[in-house]
């Protein structure tokens, strides 16, 4: 499970808005094929791990998988049936903030058909709309 080893502050503010597109990480840079987000969202460390397992099980021993996102934002939650007030809740889980255009996973060392199917299985585990991208092809991830 992906979590930060240590953080400066245990709790963060929730963001006001999720506007804009990803500034960096828009191209496939390590592998040959990738999964690119088409909408903004939070992806938990469990969802990242589920997608990774789905891909590696389908690929078997063939290729290499890169995870290009990291869950570095703590999400707090108060216990059930607790009265309001008395401070902010404890950190419950970690999420990676993803904006449109961000390449989240990459694969290399397998044929395109295998990579496409492995990525399709992984996309079902993620809470945002995604698309399959190939290295070198320029594709825009605009919300339409």
UniProtKB/Swiss-Prot annotation:
Lineage: Bacteria, Bacillati, Bacillota, Clostridia, Eubacteriales
Protein name, entry field: Large ribosomal subunit protein uL16
Family: Belongs to the universal ribosomal protein uL16 family.
Function field: Binds 23S rRNA and is also seen to make contacts with the A and possibly P site tRNAs.
GO molecular function, one term: rRNA binding
Subunit composition and interactions: Part of the 50S ribosomal subunit.
Xref: PROSITE patterns: RIBOSOMAL_L16_1, RIBOSOMAL_L16_2
NCBIfam families given in the database record: rplP_bact
Domain of life from the UniProt record: Bacteria
Ranges of Basic residues composition bias in the record: 1-16
GO CC list: cytosolic large ribosomal subunit
Keyword Transferase: no
Keyword terms, alphabetized: Ribonucleoprotein, Ribosomal protein, RNA-binding, rRNA-binding, tRNA-binding
SUPFAM superfamilies hit by this protein: Ribosomal protein L16p/L10e (SSF54686)
